[in-house]
Regions:
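Short beta-strand scaffold segments in enzyme catalytic cores
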Residues: 11-13, 18-24
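ATP-binding/phosphotransfer module of carbohydrate and carboxylate kinases, centering on a glycine-rich
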Residues: 2, 10, 45-189
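Active-site glycine-rich loop that binds ribose-phosphate moieties when present
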Residues: 1-5, 38-41
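Structural motif
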Residues: 8-10, 29
Length: 189
């Protein structure tokens, strides 16, 4: 929020799991948990079950390394099914860097999931900005995820598309963001 010079920010990290944080329109961090990893984004009875919570349709299954690994066979990519999720992500990102269309489908699918989920999150959060980050968004795949999410918002939720800006941290935000936030913390004691 500080480096963006705006508030009403929902930050979503797509990595080993899914993490999130929210800064309200007044620049405050609210006193509730923003545990979107276990909030449902797929309400279909056949949605993917989360191995930890046992719930179906949880965000973590759609916005993390697990999502990439789950989509690998559906995209027709042959990887060892016993390969750890981080390694599968790296392999898919390598394929994407080489222009592989099957890898592209994985990131497009995650982007579609994200577009619909942002619209769903907007039912609960006053959002002007969505900041997407994490290992899954590294490289060209992250750009594709944002493009597809934006396409979904424009096509299905045009009013939200006009009011919500999607972004990833630029290099300065990555390098200086934590230091700026830490320097702004009040002293305790």
């Amino acid at each position: 929020s500080m480096s963006m010079k705006d508030n009403a920010v929902l930050g979503i990290s797509l990595g080993t799991s899914m993490a999130s944080g929210y800064v309200d329109p007044d620049g405050r961090i609210r006193p509730w948990l923003n545990e979107l990893a276990f909030a449902p984004v797929d309400y279909d009875n056949g949605a993917t079950a989360d191995e930890w919570s046992q719930d179906i349709g949880c965000g973590v299954q759609y916005f993390s390394q697990q999502a990439v690994a789950r989509l690998v066979p559906a995209a027709g990519i042959a990887l060892d099914s016993g390969m750890p999720f981080p390694e599968q992500l790296v392999e898919v990102q390598k394929l994407m860097a080489n222009g592989d269309e099957k890898a592209r489908l994985i990131f497009e699918t995650i982007g579609v999931y994200l577009g619909y989920s942002i619209a769903h999150y907007a039912n609960f959060y006053d959002i002007r900005n969505v900041l997407i980050l994490g290992r899954v968004t590294s490289g060209q795949g992250g750009e594709i995820i944002l493009q597809k999410a934006d396409e979904v918002l424009r096509a299905e939720f045009p009013a939200l598309s006009e009011s919500i800006k999607l972004s990833t941290p630029d290099e300065q935000q990555k390098r200086h963001g934590q230091a700026v936030a830490a320097a702004s913390l009040p002293s305790i004691g």
